[in-house]
Amino acid sequence: MNARTTAGVATMLGSAASNQIGAAVGAHAFPFIGPAGVVAVRQVVAAAVLLPLARPDVRRFTWPQWWPTLLLAVVFATMNLSLYTAIDRIGLGLAVTLEFLGPLAVALAGSRTRLDLLCAVIACLGVYVLVLPGSSSDFLGIGLGLLAATCWAAYIVLNRVAGARLPGLQAPAVATSISAVLYLPVLLTLHHGGLGYALIAGLLSSAVPYAADLIVLRFVPPRLFGVFMSVHPVFAALAGVALLGQVLHVHHWAGIALVVMANALAVRSSRPRDERTIDAGRTLEGRAIAGG
């Protein structure tokens, strides 16, 4: 790798670390304001970052532009709440790993190659090893993690539609703002305890990764960016252990490794014409607009 690519890789790793450290910091606010409170604050921070950049003129939006934007708002609101509630129930590393099945499913959708089939098998095996279903399993937490994955997949598909009808970041900016408005009832009932944690989480998981992603794509190819996105579950697990005192057993690490492997292989094997579409969805979601 040349110096520019090396700098880009370092920035990507820093962005991933910031994102997951932010999620861990946000978890410290759960006892005070709950997952919904953290999500509410984070959505406000994300909207504050995106609106000045996109500067959308909503008065000129047509219905074909509005409907995917409104659906994006619902997806953002649901994805965040399901992810952060899953983090509260099953831990950061497990929740983020399950969430990553969403973009993986989109990357593999419609594929017929043997390698992509292998990726799907590895991912399914990874999830089974990760959760090892049993009488003590938190199936609600697992279900919420999978709901977050479904929302992320829906985001990628909807963003393709909205991106074809609205230039730049207008659709995500408006959708994030609407999502923040949906959480106004939660914001109005929050007390001051834990707000500092939530604000720091919003900055580390929204503003910093978003700015980093914009810089990174100037230095590294989209496919390399997609591969390095695969480190998020690992960083999430490490942040959970270091900052939240969460305990991960051997089967957890094995499951995370399998999902990361499947995701990286899927991105590396994607056809060149698919690169921009797949990775644009991940980038714009930016680990900044909505998901953890």
Predicted regions and their residues:
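Transmembrane alpha-helices of multi-pass small-molecule transport proteins
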Residues: 25, 31-78, 101-106, 151-158, ...
